A protein has these predicted regions:
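A short, structured beta-strand/loop element
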Residues: 19-44
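Acidic, low-complexity intrinsically disordered segments
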Residues: 44-92
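Short, charged/polar N-terminal "headpieces" of proteins
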Residues: 1-27
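Surface-exposed beta-strand edges and flanking loops
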Residues: 5, 35, 85-87
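Intrinsic disorder/low-complexity signal
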Residues: 8-11, 25, 39-41, 63, ...
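Intrinsic-disorder/low-complexity peptide segments enriched for small residues
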Residues: 1, 39, 83-86
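Short secondary-structure boundary micro-motifs
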Residues: 3-6, 14-15, 39, 53, ...
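A generic short-segment signal for beta-strand/edge and adjacent turn/coil regions
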Residues: 1-2, 32, 50-55
């Protein structure tokens, strides 16, 4: 089954990640994208902490596409298993 859009969860300053979810049927898949990956995608300078959600929303389609690709490839990390996206995940 293909992943579908879940929800924005929050920006975690101490970990420098944005947490979000994707949905597989009726199961939520926890996901995270590093702020450095988002900055690299946007070729942005320093983004203020209060702008991370807005930045995520601008990049959401690209981030979720890559999360879906990692899901299909079963590239899970962590406990509970989820998808973690870093800058290298967007290099082609």
């Amino acid at each position: 089954m293909a992943l579908t859009r879940g929800s924005f969860e929050r920006y975690e300053f101490d970990r420098m990640v944005v947490l979000f979810s994707m949905v597989d049927g009726d199961r939520a898949i926890p996901c995270a994208v590093s702020t450095s990956a988002m900055d690299d995608l946007e070729k942005a300078g320093r983004i203020q902490a209060d702008q991370r959600e807005v930045q995520f929303m601008r990049l959401r389609d690209r981030i979720e596409q890559r999360a879906a690709e990692k899901f299909v490839a079963k590239e899970f990390e962590g406990v509970p298993p989820g998808i973690i996206l870093r800058s290298l995940d967007f290099r082609k």
